[in-house]
Amino acid sequence: MNPQELKSILSHGLLSFPVTDFNAQGDFNPAGYIKRLEWLAPYGASALFAAGGTGEFFSLAASEYSQVIKTAVDTCATSVPILAGVGGSTRQAIEYAQEAERLGAKGLLLLPHYLTEASQDGVAAHVEAVCKSVNIGVVVYNRNVCRLNADLLEKLAERCPNLIGYKDGLGDIELMVSIRRRLGERFSYLGGLPTAEVYAAAYKALGVPVYSSAVFNFVPKTAMDFYNAIARDDHATVAKLIDDFFLPYLDIRNRKAGYAVSIVKAGARIAGYDAGPVRTPLTDLTAEEYEMLAALMDKMGPQ
């Protein structure tokens, strides 16, 4: 799959990022991960992101990363394209990018660089180096310390033909509008704020109809129903699902920092696809919060 073919795929449909399965000892559990991917693949996501933020990329050792990406690629070879999360320092991101390409990933999600505050030019140099290290398509993720503006994204688009996507995790509407207007159809644009459904209607109005869904990990039917309602401008269904599910879900998620990942793993366990605990420094939901989530999921009916 060449970068432009990937861009076309990412321009339509719902995207998601499966959680990474760990066993009771905290080690990668490939059998559980295969079961998860086989469960999710038929629901109709356009692409899946392996070892992304929700997949706890930040906690994976290099050898584990290779196992996760290989397992995802092999399992989904005939069903759904796999993009691999990459990040960290520039050299580390390049190593991960080249490994993901070697293992057969169709593209990359370039997560924010590690910790260090950096100038726009420095961040752009980081993105360019990663793009030029591979031939597969790259989606850059503007979030946290990565805040590329429209000017630099335009320059990067000229220098890096395989930079084919922009994912927004900032929620800066002025910046999003300027990027969308300046870059036009050069990129595929993805909504990437936590619990992106809450922002989906607003982002669609900005020209960003595609987003990645965390809740697809445990209520895939509900996630697809919501996406389809957004796509056909069914405002009544969108409002009902936000009121009935997403706002109560946010009440639980927002109780502690890091719960954007923890609550997804809890949901997967409730759904019968236990992915094990989150790794430190994240913490799992309390027993009370777990029961609150279980009751909320029960209201959504069979998936």
From Swiss-Prot:
The keyword NADP does not apply. Keywords: Lyase. It catalyses: 5-dehydro-4-deoxy-D-glucarate + H(+) = 2,5-dioxopentanoate + CO2 + H2O. GO terms for biological process: D-glucarate catabolic process. Coiled coil: none annotated. GO terms for molecular function: 4-hydroxy-tetrahydrodipicolinate synthase activity; 5-dehydro-4-deoxyglucarate dehydratase activity. Belongs to the DapA family. This is 5-dehydro-4-deoxyglucarate dehydratase.
